[in-house]
Amino acid sequence: MEIIYKICMVIELLQLSVNNGYDEYNMLQNIEKSENGFTNEVKGMPFDEYKQWLKKEDDYSKSQNLPDNWIPQTTFFLNIDGIPVGIGRVRHYSSEYLEQNGVGNLGYGIAKPYRGKGYGNILFENLLIKCKLLGYKRIKLFPYINNISTNKIMLKHGAKLLGTINDEKHIYEIEI
């Protein structure tokens, strides 16, 4: 019997594009509409509407067609060996309104088939780099207290607990 070891993987954090297709769409079907505070509008959406959603999200990254009180944000897909496994968003700056409502500077989700493989940690690390490139010195995050995996990832990256919101969300700050 021949044993083959995989010694490396190709990790890519790719900015959402209007040209994204079925691979990303299918991955998004494996993340709930609202799970642990992360919103996935694409769950259950027909593919033709998904293409319109891509355009809307691309516009948001360019500060175009934003709803009132929204901050520009860029959406990224995490690909491992060419396969989309997760999605993340980075807001271009912070606001008092978002913080008062427990909305952090970044958010992410990993598709169910790919959980428990360390991809959440990889995605989070790469989103922190994007935050730094946007000029953040520190970010605030508001994970649900019962979201054990995300809390562990944030603490691993130096999150300092500042408090809680209504006994359901932690308030963390990370210096980057």
Model-derived features with residue positions:
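Conserved GNAT acetyl-CoA-binding A-motif
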Residues: 133-142
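GNAT-family acyltransferases
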Residues: 2-105, 166-176
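Conserved beta-strand-loop-alpha-helix junction that forms the acyl-donor binding cleft
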Residues: 141-151
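Conserved acetyl-CoA-binding loop-helix of GNAT-fold acetyltransferases
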Residues: 108-110, 116-129, 152-156
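Loop/helix-junction capping segments adjacent to catalytic residues or to phosphate/diphosphate-binding pockets
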Residues: 21, 117, 148
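Conserved catalytic-core motifs of GNAT/GCN5-like acyltransferases
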Residues: 142, 155-174
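Short coil/turn motifs at secondary-structure junctions
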Residues: 93-95, 113, 146
